[in-house]
Amino acid sequence: VIKRLLFALCFSSNCLWAQPPAQNPDAQKRALLKISAAEKAYKKDLWPNINPAYFFANLRKNVEHPLYIHQGKPTYFCGYAALTHLLALVDPEEYVKLVVDVLQSGHTLTKDHKKLTATKEIREAAGTLYNKGEMDINHADQVWFMVLADSYKGYLNWKNPTYKPGGENGFWAASNYKKFNRMLRSLTGLEVHARGADLIGPIMGSYYDFIEEKNEENTVILYLNNKVLYPNKFFKFILRTPTHFVVLYDLKREGKYNVLDYWDYGLRTQMKLRKNKFRKLVYGITYIENQ
């Protein structure tokens, strides 16, 4: 206004940049009250494998500490985690409303009136994902990410439209760039601008200068080629398209390098890249005017 999650937020070395808006404390309090009310009213009818203690602890943590939101390893939930990071920051009440609706009734409506539905396969699988790091006990994330993956489809999902065990690690869960921006508009109700594509980066001069300009009054989300960002990562990439979405906190120049300070995998991370490598890294630049 987020296979190591999410978005990255940018600043320049000589100009103050806009970060994602700080979470409104009153909105956070109202969101936490909604969580407490939902916890008291919870019935385990729809979700046989959800542990309510894990679920509500996870939901509270996401509202209180959006930076900690994590996609799990080695899933393709990166885009959903990035979206959730942003939504929990800018509209924690809407985020809680959507997740609690899905928990209580198995469906919810987004701001653009899209119906998100938890299918029988999703309801039975949520709570059973394991060997995913901290996601093993993040049951709210399991519910929410799986519902998003099942409700929004792009061309990467055509051959795997229905969840099957292990689908979180492959094409069923993948997000291409156009799908990600569509989800972002749907969930936030905000005007979303995007430059770039899955197979080629934005056609323009300096990426750095463009991001610097847009980040003065916008939150900037980058679509990155993870094979360039993390060439030695332990898991195997199976997609030929970029796979990583990050929300940038700072971008500055240090001699021959661009230094990125960004959020992904539940942390803020800093990385120094040569300028030519930075251009190879970026495939999409999404920006949203800060409210």
PLM regions and their residue ranges:
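Short, flexible beta-strand-to-coil junctions
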Residues: 149-164, 223-230, 252, 265-267
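Active-site-adjacent substructure of cysteine-protease-like catalytic cores
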Residues: 195-260
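Short, flexible loop/turn elements at secondary-structure junctions
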Residues: 74, 82, 87, 224-228, ...
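Active-site nucleophile-adjacent alpha helix/oxyanion-hole segment immediately C-terminal to the catalytic cysteine
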Residues: 25-160, 211-221
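Bacterial Sec-dependent N-terminal signal peptides
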Residues: 1-20
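Cys-His-centered catalytic/binding microenvironment captured across papain-like cysteine peptidases
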Residues: 236-243, 252-291
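Extracellular-facing segments of soluble proteins and assemblies that are Gly/Ser/Thr-biased and enriched
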Residues: 128-200
